[in-house]
A protein has these predicted regions:
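Non-catalytic signal-transmission and effector/linker regions of two-component phosphorelay proteins
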Residues: 1-4
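Conserved acidic carboxylate
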Residues: 7
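Two-component/phosphorelay signaling modules centered on CheY-like receiver
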Residues: 10-34, 74
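CheY-like receiver
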Residues: 41-127
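Residue-level detector of beta-strand face positions
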Residues: 129-131
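Conserved small/polar residues in nucleotide/adenosyl-binding loops
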Residues: 134-136
């Protein structure tokens, strides 16, 4: 599973990359990720680079994570999006962009890993179907 992680805070990115590395070491060695410090760079990369999951901070300068999700949904209605934020204020709005989950910071393994486990299981169960479409 390939993840795009987008957060403007270097501190949060350090914490999240530590958690993703821990997840890779303890649960799924095939997990990979790319890091983005703003939504503009993420939006420019998505059309040319495949991601299986997006982890988006909501409150970022410029294009917010919610704005990025709206733009992504115009061309990709299926990619799972998990919002990571320190505010519960946008939880209801996250349903409008079909978010897979909404996690409040600070994150730890107890919050993040069960969500990743579920999405990874969904991803793996859909993989044979996706591969069959590629070979058609």
């Amino acid at each position: 599973m390939h993840i795009a992680l987008c957060d403007d805070s270097r501190t949060e990115l350090s914490r999240l990359t530590f958690l993703l590395e821990e997840y890779r070491l303890t649960r799924d060695g095939s997990l990979t990720y790319d890091i983005f410090t703003n939504a503009t760079d993420l939006l420019e990369t998505i059309p040319v680079h495949h991601f299986d999951l997006l982890l988006l901070d909501i409150l970022m300068p410029g294009i917010t994570g919610m704005d990025a999700a709206r733009e992504i949904r115009q061309t990709n209605s299926t990619i799972p999006i998990i919002f990571l934020t320190s505010s519960s204020e946008y939880a209801v709005e996250s349903y409008r962009v079909n978010a897979a989950d909404y996690l409040l910071k600070p994150l730890d393994a107890d919050k993040l890993f069960p969500v990743l486990d579920k999405l990874l299981a969904d991803f793996k169960s859909n993989a044979p179907y996706i591969l069959s479409l590629i070979h058609i």
